[in-house]
Swiss-Prot record:
Gene name, Swiss-Prot/TrEMBL: panC
InterPro entries the record matches: Pantoate_ligase (IPR003721), Pantoate_ligase_C (IPR042176), Rossmann-like_a/b/a_fold (IPR014729)
Entry GO MF terms: ATP binding; pantoate-beta-alanine ligase activity
Organism: Coxiella burnetii (strain Dugway 5J108-111)
Keywords of this entry: ATP-binding, Cytoplasm, Ligase, Nucleotide-binding, Pantothenate biosynthesis
Entry's localization field: Cytoplasm
Pfam families referenced in this protein's UniProt entry, alphabetically: Pantoate_ligase
Protein name: Pantothenate synthetase
């Protein structure tokens, strides 16, 4: 039976009772979909206990409207956790997780490309909340999707830099039948925007060069933040209407921009 915990002191008491067990952790902002469920299933396969967090982290939004419009589906998410046999759900309040009112934060002073360039201070909020959650949950393993690939690499660096006793595991992107990565943002797309998002995915996954992809997307009416190759992967961030979508794929060495 899934136990839902709001008070962090309650969780801290519970955590002491499972010290001898392996604990898998999947941090999310809720609005769960099949991509999240794939992370949870892997955790269940590899650990005795699986913990899911549901927390819409205000400090990682550099756009107030984006935070305001983020889907809030707590009851639905808890029901999905119960259906999928998750042991514990952490659902803390903002004040509980930020008793310091965000006076203390984790930052990476060297990152300035891709999401760091287009979403100022975003990763400060991400790294800070991840650090708080990892210290609270003390997981054996924590699972992150590769859709947010830059975030995944930063979290791995965070765990290494601060000697956290947690293995950070990246999991493959879950896509729909058109190749579009599953994302909570997809649910905000109108029917016409969804068709355009599918075109983004088709063009991005083509054999075109970065510049050719940019031009093709612009011709479709899609606003491009970046299409670039970095460390043997191709990355994209675009706007379909007011919805921002990201994707990344590994590529062959002879197909760089």
């Amino acid at each position: 039976m899934t136990k839902v915990i709001e008070a962090l002191s309650d969780w801290q008491s519970i955590r002491k009772t499972i010290n001898d067990l392996s604990v898998g952790f999947v941090p999310t902002m809720g609005n769960l979909h099949a991509g999240h469920l794939s992370l949870l299933e892997r955790s269940k396969c590899e650990n005795t206990i699986t913990v899911l967090s549901l927390f819409i982290n205000p400090t990682q939004f550099n756009n107030k409207n984006d935070f305001k419009n983020y889907p809030r589906t707590l009851a639905q998410d808890i029901a999905m956790a119960e259906e999928n046999g998750i042991d514990y759900v952490l659902a803390p309040t903002d004040d509980a997780l930020y008793p310091d009112q965000y006076a203390y934060k984790i930052t990476n002073s060297t990152i300035n490309n891709q999401e760091a360039e287009f979403r100022p201070r975003h990763f400060d909020g991400v790294l800070t909340v991840v650090m708080k959650l990892l210290l609270l949950v003390k997981p054996t393993r924590a699972y992150f999707g590769e859709k947010d690939y830059q975030q995944l690499q930063l979290v791995k660096g965070l765990a290494e830099a601060f000697f956290l006793d947690t293995e950070i595991i990246g999991c493959k992107i879950v896509r729909n039948e058109f190749g579009l990565p599953l994302s909570s943002r997809n649910r905000r797309l109108t029917e016409d925007q969804y068709q355009l998002a599918q075109r983004f995915s088709e063009i991005f996954h083509s054999d075109l060069s970065c510049d050719e992809i940019k031009n093709a997307l612009i011709q479709e009416g899609i606003i491009v933040d970046y299409i670039e190759d970095y460390n043997e992967r191709r990355f994209a961030a675009v706007h379909v209407g007011d919805i921002r979508l990201i994707d990344n794929i590994p590529f062959a060495k002879d197909k760089k921009c």
